[in-house]
UniProtKB/Swiss-Prot annotation:
Membrane topology annotation: Multi-pass membrane protein
Glycosylation site list: N59
Main location: membrane
Protein name per its UniProtKB record: CASP-like protein 1F1
Stretches of the chain found on the membrane's Cytoplasmic side: 1-16, 87-105, 172-179
Family designation: Belongs to the Casparian strip membrane proteins (CASP) family.
Length: 179
């Protein structure tokens, strides 16, 4: 019975599972942040009222600019961390290396969460407005712009969840550090 438990709970199998999960989650994070960035950057809609043309673009809002920048940074840093993880390969069981991944994932998760929060706040104003401040909703007129922005934010929230899972797994693995 002990041999069966040792076989399924061996450190090597645990290490392979950890690395496999890390690689898969980082690939999903890279894809989600890249897609969120691309959708938001290409999000533009124009409407015409007689001779007057109104345009909605992501770069008209500092919150959307921050959202895009946060996703670009998270995507680039996730690519670097994926390369770091692949380069370490067998040596990634070093608790010091895992702790660096934990810090990286925590910072990237915080950055993506901040970007998502800023974009969500502006998206909420765009959808519902704020009558007390005199801000009217614009999503009635700019439906395509708002829908694409919503998809971009959903992808970014997906990447934030992946980064949260990476943070938790790295924190769990780095508990082996002996001071």
């Amino acid at each position: 019975m002990e041999n069966v438990e040792d076989k399924y709970n061996s450190p090597l199998k645990s290490q392979k599972l950890f690395i496999g999960a890390q690689i898969c989650l980082r690939i999903v994070t890279i894809g989600a942040t890249l897609a969120a960035t691309w959708i938001m950057v290409t999000d533009k809609q124009s409407i015409t009222f007689g001779d007057f043309v109104m345009v909605a673009k992501y770069n008209y809002s500092s919150a959307f600019k921050f959202f895009v920048l946060a996703n670009v940074i998270a995507c680039a840093c996730s690519v670097v961390s994926l390369l770091f993880l692949c380069a370490l390969g067998r040596y990634s069981s070093n608790p010091g290396h895992v702790f660096l991944l934990f810090l990286h994932d925590l910072l990237m998760m915080s950055l993506v969460l901040a970007g998502c929060s800023a974009a969500t706040a502006i998206g909420f104003l765009g959808k519902y407005g704020n009558t007390k401040s005199g801000w009217m909703p614009i999503c009635d007129q700019f439906g395509q712009f708002c829908n694409r922005g919503t998809i971009s934010m959903m992808l970014s929230y997906l990447s934030m969840v992946c980064l949260l899972i990476l943070t938790v797994t790295s924190a769990n693995k780095s508990r082996q550090i002996h001071v």
